[in-house]
């Protein structure tokens, strides 16, 4: 009888493990039902808004950084976070259900974003620019721990040249 118990216990434990794996929380889901439209269900968190933002000026050598980023809402006085609150779907606003967060930043706080990417291989005479379609009011851009630029202005596009701050392998981009 004891010989049968051990395999039964093992099978039960394996079953519990498999059940936990299949019920794990997804990396992203729509947060709530705020202002839901028919198109919200069509959002693909692996490829959100994949099209080139300015079709008349499309280039062959560009990459889209939209997707799941780390985010943190922290007091304005705090430095770059070491721990983030979760994942946010860029380019959607943190307050939006489509961001997967649906939280307000609140007075006295700021929002931090972080992602990693691999830079395309450039020739010596080319520069690598990060184009931002819009950032609400004020942003500071960091590449690999280096503060590069602070931009002020509501929802106007800007770019940052990151060429001189690239390293081998993955790049870390942080936006405050």
Residue locations for each model-derived region?
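Bacterial Sec-dependent N-terminal signal peptides
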Residues: 1-27
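Aromatic- and Gly/Pro-rich amphipathic surface segment
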Residues: 84-103
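Accessory beta-strand-rich segments of carbohydrate-active enzymes
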Residues: 70-74, 103-176
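Predominantly extracellular/luminal regions of secreted and cell-surface proteins
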Residues: 68-90
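N-terminal accessory segment at the very beginning of proteins
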Residues: 3, 24, 45-54, 98-101, ...
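N-terminal pre-domain segments of enzymes
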Residues: 25-62
């Amino acid at each position: 009888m004891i010989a049968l118990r051990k395999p039964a216990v093992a099978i039960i434990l394996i079953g519990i493990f498999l059940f936990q794996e299949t019920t794990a929380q997804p990396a992203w889901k729509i947060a709530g039902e705020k202002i839901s439209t028919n198109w919200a269900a069509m959002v693909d968190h692996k490829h959100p808004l994949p099209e080139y933002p300015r079709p008349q000026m499309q280039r062959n050598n560009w990459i889209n950084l939209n997707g799941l980023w780390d985010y943190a809402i922290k007091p304005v006085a705090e430095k770059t976070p070491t721990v983030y609150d979760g994942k946010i779907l860029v380019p959607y606003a943190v307050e939006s259900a489509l961001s997967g967060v649906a939280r307000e930043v609140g007075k006295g706080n700021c929002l931090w974003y972080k992602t990693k990417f691999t830079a395309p291989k450039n020739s010596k005479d080319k520069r690598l620019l990060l184009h931002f379609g819009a950032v609400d009011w004020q942003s500071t851009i960091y590449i690999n721990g280096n503060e590069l630029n602070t931009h002020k202005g509501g929802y106007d596009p800007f770019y940052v040249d990151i060429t001189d701050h690239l390293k081998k392998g993955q790049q870390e981009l942080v936006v405050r």
